[in-house]
Amino acid sequence: MLNFIRSDKDKGKGNDNDINFSNIPKHIAIIMDGNGRWAKKRNLPRTMGHKAGGEALKRIVRECSDIGVKYLTVYGFSTENWIRPKEEVNAIMRLIVEFLKREFNELNKNNVIINPIGNILGLPEACITALNDAKNKTKNNTGLMLNLALNYGGRDEILNAVKNIFASYEENKISKDEIFNLSDEEFSSYLYTGCIPDPDIIIRPSGEKRLSNFLLWQCAYSEFWYSNINWPDFSIEDLHTAIKDYQNRDRRFGGVK
């Protein structure tokens, strides 16, 4: 596995020795919350908070890749976020394109798979083009899969899956009996996340303690970890703290031990 080169800002942060590398979560999901609060505390425009959030994403992707996380899913823009001021939405869309252009070479060099999930066709054309380009160019990589949840909503995802099942029935690709006997795993294959394993832990910074329509089907047995730190300030050390907490939990999946 190729390692990212940490910037001077990130060197020395976190303590790898505190992590049990035999029990690294396979799939980490993060609700990247608190960009606006971060900017407000500094009397900056909200767009500056979103830009700083991109820097946080960059360092967390690096660290997840380095320590052996297989899947990282980040909630970047929800189906409900369209109600925000138009200028903020437009700025977020520009930042998505800029992030992909700026970071693509390093991500690709380090074997990262870029996988957008959500109603991607509902995004502006420039975003669609940038996302599809990054996806196609990294699809044969074998390292960390970075799932970018954009124009994503858990309810929308489940409803879309049901529609896709019905469409498959109409096209004689699946029978009525097969629909009635669908397993959890088979239904999951119709979701935006496809056959990606469910998240082991969902992290939410900013102090909020709710799912906000994120991975509603997939989070059935996920562990949750909350922090009062706003996303732009989320550090490698904070990631390690969340992982160590996860490693100390007793996951029973409905059973007993």
Swiss-Prot record:
The keyword Endoplasmic reticulum does not apply. PANTHER family: DEHYDRODOLICHYL DIPHOSPHATE SYNTHASE 2 (PTHR10291:SF0), DEHYDRODOLICHYL DIPHOSPHATE SYNTHASE FAMILY MEMBER (PTHR10291). One of its GO terms (biological process) is polyprenol biosynthetic process. Homodimer. Pfam families: Prenyltransf. Mg(2+) binds at D33, E223. GO terms for molecular function: ditrans,polycis-undecaprenyl-diphosphate synthase [(2E,6E)-farnesyl-diphosphate specific] activity; magnesium ion binding; manganese ion binding. GO terms for cellular component: cytosol. Belongs to the UPP synthase family. Substrate binds at residues 34-38, 46, 50, 78-80, 82, 84, 204, 210-212. Its cofactor is Mg(2+). This is Isoprenyl transferase. Its EC number is 2.5.1.-. Catalyzes the condensation of isopentenyl diphosphate (IPP) with allylic pyrophosphates generating different type of terpenoids. It is an enzyme of class 2 (transferase). Binds 2 magnesium ions per subunit. The active site is at D33, N81 (proton acceptor). The gene is uppS. SUPFAM superfamilies: Undecaprenyl diphosphate synthase (SSF64005). Keywords: Magnesium, Metal-binding, Transferase.
